[in-house]
Amino acid sequence: METIAKHRYARTSAQKARLVADLIRGKKVAQALEILTFTNKKAAALVKKVLESAIANAEHNDGADIDDLKVAKIFVDEGPSMKRVMPRAKGRADRILKRTSHITVVVSDR
């Protein structure tokens, strides 16, 4: 049984979150949580929270056994970017892109 959890509009760039997602793809959830706990990245905390949500969804909604679950799929898509302005010298301005991403985790007992 596949169970999904999503975090939409996460305040990190998709490029940075994908580095973390690649670490846990295909792993058992216990091992994935351990890896995320000791990964020193902001995105690791965000991905860990989504993974914990997916585990809880599988247990509550589908009655799955946690020991059998593994990360079947995990992917990070780009969300909308917030455009901001940073003033520079001599009346100029630079545009700052505050990027967001959509983190999706699918756990399965197969």
Swiss-Prot record:
Q: Which GO terms describe its molecular function?
A: rRNA binding; structural constituent of ribosome
Task: Note whether RNA-binding occurs among the keywords.
Answer: yes
Instruction: Pull one GO CC term from this UniProt entry.
Output: cytosolic large ribosomal subunit
User: Family, per the entry?
Assistant: Belongs to the universal ribosomal protein uL22 family.
Among PANTHER family, the record links this protein to:
CHLOROPLAST 50S RIBOSOMAL PROTEIN L22-RELATED (PTHR13501), LARGE RIBOSOMAL SUBUNIT PROTEIN UL22M (PTHR13501:SF8)
Function noted in UniProt? This protein binds specifically to 23S rRNA; its binding is stimulated by other ribosomal proteins, e.g. L4, L17, and L20. It is important during the early stages of 50S assembly. It makes multiple contacts with different domains of the 23S rRNA in the assembled 50S subunit and ribosome. The globular domain of the protein is located near the polypeptide exit tunnel on the outside of the subunit, while an extended beta-hairpin is found that lines the wall of the exit tunnel in the center of the 70S ribosome.
Q: What is this protein called?
A: Large ribosomal subunit protein uL22
Q: Which organism is it from?
A: Haemophilus influenzae (strain ATCC 51907 / DSM 11121 / KW20 / Rd)
Which lineage ranks, top first, belong to the organism behind this chain?
A: Bacteria, Pseudomonadati, Pseudomonadota, Gammaproteobacteria, Pasteurellales
Q: Which gene encodes it?
A: rplV
